[in-house]
């Protein structure tokens, strides 16, 4: 209501003056307000010059009033435009305030989502640590099995050396028996009738020796079969261990890479959004200073931005920690591969030595088994000397001990 009355007063103020009567009234009012009544003269003293001067002054006053009315109209229009602009600016600020509130809510939801993702990443990390501990335990058990197999290999090699020495002893005895056979061949025809009983006894002893040799050969074949079973079990264990390590580490590395990539993409998108919002906040900083509510919301948004930056720094540190753990796992995996390759090389060397070795023979009495030794010497071809060769650098060793020492140094 007061605004309507004020507009009516303004419209009355800006109305143009009517005529001379109104001019005289205005002059009278001016004189009543304290101004000197210069034009209020008695009629008997009026002259044309005085009347002309009064008319000129009246015209000047009318022009001044018209100019003042024009200025009042312009000021009124400016005031109306200012009110409209203030109303539009208020609506614009309210719209921006609603947008900022929605944006803060959306950022809060994204913050909760990132917090859940971080918790999931922590759970995955705990699972990875447990898997790593399990792998370390499996590695220790496999190392213990490899150590036991190496001990069995060394024991087999020592047995092989003992059998080689026994074979050399038997060869010497065979040579001595051959000499005795040549000496006894000359006497055989003379003593054949006298020693028929002894020949029967020797034949029986020969049969017993052959039975003992067959039992020894069966025992040697059984040991070979057990050794082959151990080799097959070791090879299968190595394959299972290798496949288990490859599958588990491949899946873990792929999951870690995907999680890291997702976290990086989320951080990049969040940083772009934060930069964009920061630019908009800088642009509307002057406008927001006039509105206390928006200023409080901006302070809240700034606190959220600082929290998001702190969370982003923590995520970056977490990413670096995961990257270091990934590199450590890769180094351990490479060490395991190198150890497996070395074990495979030792196994190949052991297989070569087992294939080149011969089954041991039992020593037989010289005076009871010369017929059997002579027949074996005639049937069997001459044996080749053992090949003590390094499988890596082809080094020719004089004996098995030297070859073992060289192989360990060559592998290291």
Swiss-Prot record:
InterPro entries: CC2-LZ_dom (IPR032419), NEMO_N (IPR021063), NEMO_ZF (IPR034735), Optineurin/NFkB_EssMod (IPR051301). Residues 246-358 are annotated as: Self-association. Residues 375-412 are annotated as: Interaction with CYLD. Residues 315-336 are annotated as: Leucine-zipper. A zinc finger (CCHC NOA-type) spans 382-412. Residues 49-343 form a coiled coil. One of its GO terms (biological process) is DNA damage response. Residues 150-250 are annotated as: Interaction with TANK. Phosphorylation at Ser-68 attenuates aminoterminal homodimerization. Polyubiquitinated on Lys-278 via 'Lys-63'-linked ubiquitin; the ubiquitination is mediated downstream of NOD2 and RIPK2 and probably plays a role in signaling by facilitating interactions with ubiquitin domain-containing proteins and activates the NF-kappa-B pathway. Polyubiquitinated on Lys-278 and Lys-302 through 'Lys-63'-linked ubiquitin; the ubiquitination is mediated by BCL10, MALT1 and TRAF6 and probably plays a role in signaling by facilitating interactions with ubiquitin domain-containing proteins and activates the NF-kappa-B pathway. It comes from the Eukaryota. One of its GO terms (cellular component) is mitotic spindle. Residues 44-111 are annotated as: Interaction with CHUK/IKBKB. Its main location: cytoplasm. There is a cross-link at residues 111, 139, 143, 226, 246, 270, 276, 278, 285, 295, 302, 314, 319, 392 (Glycyl lysine isopeptide (Lys-Gly) (interchain with G-Cter in ubiquitin)). Residues 249-412 are annotated as: Required for interaction with TNFAIP3. Residues 1-48 are annotated as: Disordered. Residues 242-343 are annotated as: Ubiquitin-binding (UBAN). Homodimer; disulfide-linked. Component of the I-kappa-B-kinase (IKK) core complex consisting of CHUK, IKBKB and IKBKG; probably four alpha/CHUK-beta/IKBKB dimers are associated with four gamma/IKBKG subunits. The IKK core complex seems to associate with regulatory or adapter proteins to form a IKK-signalosome holo-complex. The IKK complex associates with TERF2IP/RAP1, leading to promote IKK-mediated phosphorylation of RELA/p65. Part of a complex composed of NCOA2, NCOA3, CHUK/IKKA, IKBKB, IKBKG and CREBBP. Interacts with COPS3, CYLD, NALP2, TRPC4AP and PIDD1. Regulatory subunit of the IKK core complex which phosphorylates inhibitors of NF-kappa-B thus leading to the dissociation of the inhibitor/NF-kappa-B complex and ultimately the degradation of the inhibitor. Its binding to scaffolding polyubiquitin plays a key role in IKK activation by multiple signaling receptor pathways. Can recognize and bind both 'Lys-63'-linked and linear polyubiquitin upon cell stimulation, with a much highr affinity for linear polyubiquitin. Could be implicated in NF-kappa-B-mediated protection from cytokine toxicity. Essential for viral activation of IRF3. This is NF-kappa-B essential modulator. It comes from Rattus norvegicus (Rat).
